[in-house]
A protein has these predicted regions:
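Flexible, compositionally biased loop and terminal segments
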Residues: 1-138
Length: 138
């Protein structure tokens, strides 16, 4: 579960924490459930945490790296996404995983989410497999 959890009822947060704990040893696919999530807020909270560590002497400014920022995000335990499937033909990220999506391949389909079928998913995967990933290079 990722997102700003203030305002989420405590009983639901406990259930979310229990579910996370029960599944932490699982292998395979990662499922992210975003609740009250916004990437700008996520980055802002990470920067505030790092700034407080610098202010209180636990961290030097020269120690701030991309890796440290990444480890301060909600998704610190998860790999960055390799593929983002955007349904409904929307040509925007909508404030979703902005930091983590730096090198993510994006597949855009006109199909709306409720109509997205296993065949649509296969089409996205097939296109992804044909791409040459450059990780920001030429």
């Amino acid at each position: 579960f990722i997102g700003h959890m203030e305002g989420v009822p405590k009983s639901l947060r406990r259930s979310m924490e229990e579910t996370t704990k029960q599944s932490e040893a699982n292998t395979g696919l990662n499922l992210q459930v975003a609740i009250n999530y916004g990437s700008r807020l996520e980055i802002t909270e990470a920067v505030k945490k790092i700034a407080l560590d610098v202010k209180e002497g636990r961290l030097a400014a020269d120690d701030i790296t991309e890796d440290l920022i990444g480890k301060s995000l909600y998704t610190s335990r998860l790999p960055d996404p390799e593929l983002l499937i955007r349904t409904g033909g929307e040509m925007r990220l909508s404030n979703y995983l902005l930091w983590q999506s730096a090198y993510t391949e994006i597949f855009i389909t006109q199909t709306l989410w409720p109509d997205f079928t296993p065949e649509c998913f296969d089409q996205a995967i097939d296109e992804f497999k044909r791409r040459h990933r450059r990780w920001g290079g030429d």
